Amino acid sequence: MSNKVLITNSQKAVKVPSGLRILIRRACNAVLEYEHFEAPAEISVNFVDNAAIAELNNQYRNKPMPTDVLSFPLGVDGKYDVDENNGCKMLGDIVISMERAQEQANLYGHPLQREVAFLTVHSMLHLLGYDHENGGLEAMRMREKEEAVLLQLGLPRTVSYTE
């Protein structure tokens, strides 16, 4: 049985590039493979605008400003509920601000696709229990995993991108 990646576009501010949904599915699957996550998983990814993510950021993190991505893990200590309809472990929800992703892609000089792939990989690691809020070794391990998965996807940080 394969993983289920449900992708919704709830914004109109940024055009979703062709192939982005496939890249997101590849990124989710690459993280699960890298982390040796054996069971089929279900992940929800929602594209929103800055206003929507600012509202969620305020509601759940008490930070009334836009951010690039929010993760809403459903698992606790590596244990996940199983969707009885499809047998998948429900990992959680990823919410990506496409406006912020475009701003960051422009800032870092790479395509929107690479930025959204990075945000997806980053958020997937959160869904699997990783955290970087306190810095230190956990944050370094998370960054190393992000870069390893992006390299596996052919999207390393060191490449000079052109669209």
Identify what each model region corresponds to.
Residues M1-A117, L125-E163:
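An acidic/histidine-cluster motif and surrounding catalytic segment
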